[in-house]
A protein has these predicted regions:
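Domain-length cofactor-binding catalytic modules of enzymes
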Residues: 1-190
Length: 190
């Protein structure tokens, strides 16, 4: 900082746990929606049990399709998902704390202040999905990573409701990780 303090930024997530939880619940949502549509198709047959109704029901039952990527969770499945997301967020925070402790212990540094700024998550308290964004409530401390050269911005949230009390997570990348893997070498980076 300008005051000569060292700032350690740990940019790490849940180490695959979040992705695994998301994959599990996408599958649960898909199964739930398929079951719900099959039940609805059977019910329409019983409600309209004449021959034409039977034909319509069979036709609609065969055309019932649920897209995996748009299947939604409801009720207790949604509650379980949100609960598990909170666990993933806590796990990711503990992961960052552990990394920071190991680094500071190794370097003989004393931590005088610490805060966590989470991105790409669902704020379950306010039910706000933040993809590429962070919480920036009034007075809340934020960090916005820029790039490896320029570091990160440390700031304070403005609490703007027009922006869902959010701020951008970062400046974005010039290229994807996969592209960078093939475009650059470690020697070039050094």
């Amino acid at each position: 900082t300008e005051a000569g303090e060292l700032v350690l930024v740990i940019h790490s997530g849940s180490r695959q746990l979040g992705s695994d939880v998301a994959t599990y619940y996408v599958d649960q949502a898909y199964r739930y929606q398929c079951k719900k549509q099959r039940k609805r198709a059977r019910q329409s047959y019983y409600d309209d049990a004449d021959a034409a109704g039977f034909i319509r029901q069979k036709s609609s039952q065969n055309s019932v399709q649920v897209k995996r990527e748009t299947a939604v969770l409801e009720g207790s499945l949604l509650e379980k998902y949100l609960h598990d997301l909170d666990i993933v967020v806590s796990f990711a925070d503990l992961n960052r704390q552990t990394i920071a402790k190991l680094i500071c212990d190794h370097m003989g540094l004393t931590v005088t202040d610490r805060f966590s700024c989470i991105h790409n998550y669902i704020d379950t308290e306010y039910m706000i999905l933040r993809k590429g964004a962070i919480s920036a409530r009034l007075g809340e401390r934020v960090i916005i990573p820029l790039n490896m050269r320029d570091g990160a911005l440390l700031g304070v949230g403005k609490g703007n409701p027009d922006w869902n009390f959010s701020a951008p997570h970062g400046a974005g990348r010039a290229c994807s990780r996969t592209e960078a893997k093939y475009a650059f070498t470690v020697e070039e980076f050094k």
